[in-house]
From Swiss-Prot:
This is Rhodopsin. Disulfide bonds join 89-166. A motif ('Ionic lock' involved in activated form stabilization) lies at residues 113-115. Gene3D superfamilies: Rhodopsin 7-helix transmembrane proteins. The chain crosses the membrane at residues 16-40, 53-75, 90-112, 132-152, 180-201, 243-264, 276-297. Residues 1-15, 76-89, 153-179, 265-275 are extracellular. It is found in: Cell projection, Rhabdomere membrane. Residues 41-52, 113-131, 202-242 are cytoplasmic. Belongs to the G-protein coupled receptor 1 family. Opsin subfamily. PANTHER family: OPSIN. Homodimer. Interacts with GNAQ. Contains one covalently linked retinal chromophore. It comes from Procambarus orcinus. Keywords: Cell membrane, Cell projection, Chromophore, Disulfide bond, G-protein coupled receptor, Glycoprotein, Membrane, Phosphoprotein, Photoreceptor protein, Receptor, Retinal protein, Sensory transduction, Transducer, Transmembrane, Transmembrane helix, Vision.
Length: 298
């Protein structure tokens, strides 16, 4: 445990039952939602498409994250401290990082596939089962390789300040440890966010151009619209814009707190108390709950 955390008194005992209730609620919703997503997609023949393999992979990574992290969190919240030993602390942090990284990059590939279909259209190469499987394999191999690095001295997995979980060491002043967090932030936050925004900007532009083309064609044909009245009220352009805004907003809400905790820990640790460290994984784990809704349903 870093000496920084000894500067603070123990957390209010009421925080632990509140966190336990939140984790219980989140854990049940996440496991149930992602299990149903996996079961429906794997048992419905019409849904077993290459693109939906990515959705299933997202559900699996979110399910595994909560399945491996939910029970230890319940135990540590009950005892008000980490009681599972240093080895499991590292395993716990590794699994959390691995599943989180896999989820993030699966979302990126889902977005890229939508970009390929909508923006490039017939000019784009259609996603095959082989290609989707290769993407999924690449996601897990790279995520595993990246998250194994702290076991070999590039940063470390240590207890969080609230002592209910473990994660990367963002309080170390060692340049090697910090370099890992710089690359980590780029790999799992800035780059995926940039790709997501880029893809959705061009998706919205492409759909807007298509909508304009349909309106122009309707004028040439001397009719008000090629769509019926109900479809006009909720045009594809508006629906897609809402999905894009929701996706980017939820991404930002889910992962920004954890990023800020890491960077504040590196550069302004005096502002970082044990209570604040809770919010990072609270928002990140909530992401695993609404992913099935955002990606499977949309």
């Amino acid at each position: 445990i870093h000496l920084h955390w000894y500067e603070y008194p123990p957390m209010n005992p009421m925080m632990y039952p509140l966190l336990l209730i939140f984790m219980l609620f989140t854990g049940i919703l996440c496991l149930a939602g992602n299990f149903v997503t996996i079961w429906v997609f794997m048992n419905t023949k019409s849904l077993r498409t290459p693109a939906n393999l990515l959705v299933v992979n997202l559900a699996m990574s979110d399910f595994l994250m909560m399945f491996t992290m939910f029970p230890p969190m319940m135990v540590t919240c009950y005892y008000h401290t980490w009681t599972l030993g240093p080895t499991f602390c590292q395993v716990y942090a590794f699994l959390g990082n691995l599943c989180g990284c896999a989820s993030i990059w699966t979302m990126v590939f889902i977005t890229f596939d939508r970009y390929n279909v909508i923006v490039k259209g017939v000019a784009g190469e259609p996603l095959s089962t082989k290609k989707a499987s290769l993407w999924i394999l690449t996601i897990w191999v790279l995520s595993t390789t990246w998250c194994m690095a702290p076991f070999f001295g590039w940063n470390h997995y240590v207890p969080e300040g609230n002592l209910t979980g473990c994660g990367t060491d963002y309080l170390s002043e060692d340049i090697l440890s910090r370099s890992y967090l710089y690359v980590y932030s780029t790999w799992v936050y800035f780059l995926p966010l940039a790709i997501t925004i880029y893809c959705y900007v061009f998706i919205i532009k492409a759909v807007a151009a298509h909508e304009k083309g349909m309106r122009d064609q309707a004028k040439k044909m001397g009719i008000k619209s090629l769509r019926n009245e109900e479809a006009q009220k909720t045009s594809a352009e508006c629906r897609l814009a809402k999905i894009a805004m929701t996706t980017v907003a939820l991404w930002f809400i889910a992962w920004t707190p954890y990023l800020l905790i890491n960077w504040v820990g590196m550069f302004a640790r005096s502002y970082l108390s044990p209570v604040y460290t809770i919010w990072g994984y609270v928002f990140a784990k909530a992401n695993a709950v609404y992913n099935p809704i955002v990606y499977a349903i949309s």
